[in-house]
Amino acid sequence: FGMPEEVEIQSNMGLEGAEGALATALGYATASEKINFIVLGDISFFSGMTALWNSNYGSNIRLMVINNGGNAQQQSLPGFTPDNRTLRMITGAHQTSAKAWAEDRGLTYLSAHNEEELQAALPAFVKPDITRQPLFLEVFTDKASDVEALKQYYKSLKKS
C-alpha cells in the first residue's frame, strides 16, 4: 500500500473470529506514544467492547468500527445460504449503534452513513495530533454491498 517506513502495522484477527482484537489493540496503544488506529467490524467491537472499561488507555486512540449490521465475512463464504435463523445465529445480525457506549466511555464519537459524511469525518479522525479524548468513528455500510465486495476480493485472490 505504499506506507511510509515509519508507519507500523499490527494485525490481530483472533482465531478466525472477533474475540480479543480490541483489548489487544488497546493494550498495545497504552504502551505507545504514537497515534494508534484500530479498525474493527461491528461484531468484533461488540464482542470486545468491555475492554473500554479499562480507562488506562490514552487519547492516542483512533477507533473505527465498520457497522453493517452483522458479520458480512461469514455471509461471503462459499456455501452460505441465508435464512432468518442463520442470519441471527451465525452472522450476529443486529440493528445496534455503538454511539452510547463510546460516549459513555469518554470517546469523542463521529459517524458516517454515506460517502459524503465519511469524507467530512475523516480529516478529524486521521489528524496526526493527539486529541483531548480518544476518537471513535462508526461507519455504517450496506451489508449486501460488503458481502459482494468480499466475494469479489476472494475471487481476485484465486486468480493471482
What are these regions (language model features)?
Residues F1-S160:
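Thiamine diphosphate
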